Swiss-Prot record:
It is found in: Endoplasmic reticulum membrane. The keyword Glycoprotein applies. This is Glycosylphosphatidylinositol anchor biosynthesis protein 11. Pathway: Glycolipid biosynthesis; glycosylphosphatidylinositol-anchor biosynthesis. GO terms for biological process: GPI anchor biosynthetic process. Pfam families: PIG-F (PF06699). Coiled coil: none annotated.
Length: 236
C-alpha cells in the first residue's frame, strides 16, 4: 500500500496585500483630493489675534455687541486667509485650467455666503445640543456664525464647494493621518473640539464674567483653530 501524501498547505501573504492597499490609499489621498502646502502663511494667526481683540474691546461686558462687531472683522480676515489657501493649494498649482485663477474672487465671496447659510443649521444643532432656548438666542446665533466662518469657510475654499470630494476624502482609508497633515482640516477639527471643551467651565461655581454664555465656547473655537494650524506646521 503506497504511503499517503501529505496535503500541501497554501499560504497567502496578507501583509503584502495590506501594504499594497495602504500604498494605494495614500496615493488616492495625495492625488485625488486637494492638499495644502504646510506653511506659516496658512497658520490662522488671525484667530488668536481676533479673540484677543474681542476680549480687549469688552466681550465680557457686551457679549452681543462685541460678537457682532467681531463678525465684521472676521469676514475680511477670512477672505484674505481664503486667498492664501488658494495660493498654497497643491492641486490648484497642478491644474492647467486658466479659469480657476480667474474665479478666485467668486470662490472666496461665495464661500462666505455659503458659510452664513450653513450657520442656520449649525444654530439649530447648538440648540439641540443644549444651548439656552429661553434666553441668549441672539448670542447663540452669533456664535453659530463665528463657528461657521471658522470651521466651514476654509474647507469650502480648499475643496471649491465639492461636497462629494470631501465625503469621499472622509471615507477613505488613512483619513485621520491625512487630516493631521492638513492645516486647514486640522484647524477645523480642533475648532470643533475647542468649542466642545468650552462648555466645561460654564457650570463651574467660579462666578467669573468670562463664564457667561457663549464666551467660553467662542474662545475654545478660536484657540482650537489657531492651535490646529500651528501644530500641523510644527509637527509636520
Amino acid at each position: 500500500m503506497p504511503p499517503k501524501l501529505k496535503a500541501t498547505r497554501k499560504s497567502v501573504s496578507f501583509q503584502h496585500l495590506s501594504d499594497e492597499d495602504i500604498s494605494k490609499s495614500q496615493y488616492i489621498l495625495k492625488t485625488e483630493f486637494p492638499r495644502i502646502e504646510t506653511s506659516t502663511l496658512t497658520i490662522p494667526f488671525h484667530s488668536a489675534l481676533l479673540i484677543f481683540g474681542l476680549y480687549k474691546f469688552g466681550l465680557t461686558n457686551d457679549i452681543y455687541g462685541v460678537m457682532l462687531k467681531g463678525i465684521f472683522s472676521l469676514i475680511p480676515l477670512q477672505l484674505l486667509y481664503g486667498y492664501l489657501i488658494t495660493t498654497r493649494s497643491e492641486k490648484e498649482k497642478k491644474t492647467k485650467s486658466h479659469n480657476n485663477s480667474e474665479n478666485v474672487p467668486l470662490l472666496l465671496a461665495g464661500g462666505i455666503v455659503i458659510s452664513l447659510v450653513l450657520s442656520v443649521p449649525l444654530f439649530v444643532a447648538l440648540i439641540l445640543l443644549g444651548a439656552p432656548l429661553a434666553s441668549h438666542l441672539k448670542e447663540t446665533y452669533l456664535l453659530s456664525i463665528h463657528l461657521s466662518l471658522l470651521i466651514f469657510y476654509p474647507s469650502l475654499v480648499l475643496y471649491k464647494y465639492d461636497y462629494k470630494s470631501l465625503v469621499k476624502f472622509l471615507d477613505a482609508d488613512g483619513v485621520y493621518n491625512a487630516i493631521a497633515k492638513n492645516q486647514i482640516l486640522l484647524s477645523a477639527v480642533l475648532a470643533v473640539i475647542g468649542t466642545w471643551f468650552g462648555v466645561i467651565p460654564i457650570p463651574l461655581d467660579w462666578d467669573r464674567d468670562w463664564q457667561q454664555w457663549p464666551i467660553t465656547l467662542l474662545t475654545g473655537a478660536y484657540i482650537g483653530s489657531f492651535v490646529g494650524g500651528i501644530a500641523c506646521f510644527l509637527f509636520q
